[in-house]
């Protein structure tokens, strides 16, 4: 049976990965031409994209390090 820490770690890694993907997509959309239809669609959409852009900027490097450390830890546990 799998212990609770393993399940919580898997859930945490999944949430972090999804947040990194959404934030990365927001950075891509934000870097498009300002006259593009995505950024001119609505103020709420532009605000949401900006928030995810800042989240992406703040978690990109730490998130990558955490995901890599977890991967290395799982490799060491298999040995």
Curated annotation (Swiss-Prot):
Residues 1-8, 69-79 are intravirion. InterPro entries: Poxvirus_I5. The chain crosses the membrane at residues 9-29, 48-68. It is found in: Virion membrane. GO terms for cellular component: membrane; viral envelope; virion membrane. It comes from the Viruses. Residues 30-47 are virion surface. Induction: Expressed in the intermediate phase of the viral replicative cycle. Disulfide bonds: none annotated. It is a multi-pass membrane protein. Keywords: Late protein, Membrane, Transmembrane, Transmembrane helix, Viral envelope protein, Virion. Its main location: virion. Envelope protein. Belongs to the orthopoxvirus OPG081 family. This is Protein OPG081.
């Amino acid at each position: 049976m799998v212990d609770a820490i393993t399940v919580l770690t898997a859930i945490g890694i999944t949430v972090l990965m999804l947040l990194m993907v959404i934030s990365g997509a927001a950075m891509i959309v934000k870097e498009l031409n300002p006259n593009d239809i995505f950024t001119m669609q609505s103020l709420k959409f532009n605000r949401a994209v900006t928030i995810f852009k800042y989240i992406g900027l703040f978690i990109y490097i730490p998130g990558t390090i955490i995901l890599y450390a977890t991967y290395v830890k799982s490799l060491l546990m298999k040995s």
